[in-house]
Amino acid sequence: MTDWRDVVLASHNQHKLEELRSLLADLPWRLHGAGELAIPEPDEPACTFVENALIKARHAARLSGRWALADDSGIVVDALAGAPGVHSARFAGPKADAKANIDKLLKATETLEGAARSCRFVCVIVLMRSADDPSPIIAEGVWTGRLSRIPRGKGGFGYDPVFLDASSGLSAAELSPEQKHTLSHRGKALAQLRARLAG
């Protein structure tokens, strides 16, 4: 029988795995990345973060036989009709890296001024206790800010260097890990998840 503490993260993103391991370090879980278990990535055909997270969690739970935690997240720019949104990881193409995605986003927003540069990070986390879990836990966090015109900072990953936190004015890549955990969309979603697990 599979130990419930062995939880698979339905992601091949090593940065995301490291961040979630840090954020969940006090839980009795052993978090394993999908890549470590040779679980292939599923198609993510949906148009919402919630649907994509459910697809990923169910896929990982089915193939691993373990509890599965999925995170679908991205940056949303209202002036771009919500783009990059659910396509954040592949905004500049299926094989794009963070730099290419950032470059495309900055190019698409170069004429935007003031409030039009507002944006938000969105994170939806789903926990499924089996592939047939009839009531998965769904948690969502939002982090509001605005787009920088140039990348700033060396920390974080993804779009962090161009996301300016609304309260501090620092980019997500300029924040310490502790500051980021407190403010971030992922930190907020995980706080909701913890509350649901405790309740």
Question: What does each model-found stretch correspond to?
Answer:
Residues 2-8, 14-32, 36-199:
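Anionic-ligand binding patches
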